[in-house]
Regions:
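Glycine-rich, charge-dense phosphate/pyrophosphate-binding loop(s)
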Residues: 15-119
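Regular secondary-structure segments
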Residues: 5-16
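Conserved mixed alpha/beta catalytic, RNA-binding, or beta-rich assembly cores of soluble enzyme
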Residues: 1-3
């Protein structure tokens, strides 16, 4: 029920109002809850990869929000307020990531749905 409340009362309004702080906070909290459910299968950690977990914590400390991991990982993700903030995160963490065998990429959302047409 708590995840449902986060989605309905925080995540969706955050998207609708372009409020990255609200959206990101909801994503992070949902990810913490879900990661906690899998911690026993992941050596006691909410992260499937300790390296991704360390990098995610560093991104959070540097101002990123909406931090989590894909399904069982090891892909981690975070949101930044703008391109400049994303590049600051990238340049601050890329060498640390490489040392842990990780790759950091900057990606943008595609703000339009898919189109289906005749072949």
């Amino acid at each position: 029920a708590h995840i449902c409340r986060l989605v309905l009362m925080k995540l969706i309004p955050g998207v609708k109002e372009a409020d990255l702080a609200a959206f990101g906070s909801a994503i992070s909290e949902i990810q913490e809850i879900v990661g906690g459910h899998f911690a026993n299968e992941q050596g006691g950690s909410p992260w499937s990869s300790s390296a991704v977990g360390r990098l995610a914590n560093r991104m959070r400390d540097m101002g990123a929000t909406g931090i989590g991991q894909s399904s069982w990982g090891p892909t981690g993700f975070a949101f930044a307020a703008n391109q400049q903030a994303a590049e600051r995160l990238y340049h601050s963490l890329v060498e640390e990531a490489k040392a842990d065998g990780l790759e950091i990429i900057i990606a943008q959302g595609r703000n339009a749905g898919a189109r289906i047409g005749p072949a």
